[in-house]
Regions:
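Conserved C-terminal guanine-recognition region of P-loop GTPase G domains, centered on the G4
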Residues: 124-194
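Conserved G1/Walker A P-loop phosphate-binding module
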Residues: 7, 12-108
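Extreme N-terminal basic, low-complexity initiation segments
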Residues: 2-6
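Glycine- and Gly-Pro-enriched alpha-helical subdomains that act as flexible
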Residues: 115-118, 141
Length: 223
């Protein structure tokens, strides 16, 4: 009888802890981000559990700057004027159940064919088989959206049934009218089946909108 009561109490405590996690605002969750692992091949992937959100984009699309702004860090994800710096899957742990995953930048012409094929295979395998993956944030430079690889990646994600959110970065480089033109162009190209927003790591434009998307995927509170 006592063991049954102890078991019930443990179950209640576990449920309360889980409820507390879901009540935590997304901003607090992402601010806890810590680098945990770099993956060069499938055998190095961590256990397929919890909730993961991946961030993908062409080399020099502003992907690392987006992650740093989102997590309120200056150098959580390495930024560089040299494209192609992210050469593996980089895992950032948010809490014991949630992770943000920075995928290798694609489309860098100076990368050898063999390495490019390896990256593409690693990305494809991760997106295709990862049960913990709740959604994909695809990053594009608002001035040059829908370049080689962008549409292919978006279509691959949608075919897999993966929730897709497109973020057009460096929006501070364009006026409002040009921004809206870019949003319409990208949304139309994908048939309106993915959500699209503008974003600036410099000014913070679009940060709250991105947080709302991530809150839904990570199953926590917005704000």
């Amino acid at each position: 009888m006592i063991s049954e009561i102890d078991g019930a109490e443990s179950d209640i405590i576990a449920r309360l802890r889980q409820l507390k996690k879901t009540m935590t605002p997304i901003r607090h969750i992402v601010e806890q981000a810590e680098y945990t692992l770099s993956v060069h091949n499938r055998s190095q992937l961590p256990p397929d559990a919890g909730i993961e959100v991946a961030v993908a984009g062409r080399s020099n699309s502003g992907k690392s700057s987006l992650i740093n702004r989102l997590c309120r860090r200056k150098a959580l994800a390495r930024t560089s004027r040299t494209p192609g710096r992210t050469q593996q899957l980089v895992f950032f742990q948010l809490d014991d159940e949630r992770s943000l995953v920075d995928l290798p930048g694609y489309g860098y012409a100076k990368v050898g064919a063999e390495l490019r094929k390896h990256w593409e295979g690693l990305i494809q395998n991760y997106l295709e088989s990862r049960a913990a993956l709740a959604g994909l944030v695809q990053v594009m430079d608002i001035r040059h959206p829908l370049k080689d690889g962008d549409i292919q990646l978006a279509e691959f994600a949608l075919h897999r049934g993966l929730p897709l959110h497109l973020v057009l970065t460096k929006a501070d480089k364009l006026g409002h009218g040009k921004r809206m033109e870019a949003v319409h162009k990208v949304r139309s190209a994908l048939g309106g089946v993915a959500t699209v927003q503008v974003f600036s790591a410099t000014t913070g434009l679009g940060l709250e909108e991105l947080e709302h998307v991530l809150a839904a995927w990570f199953q926590v509170m917005p704000g």
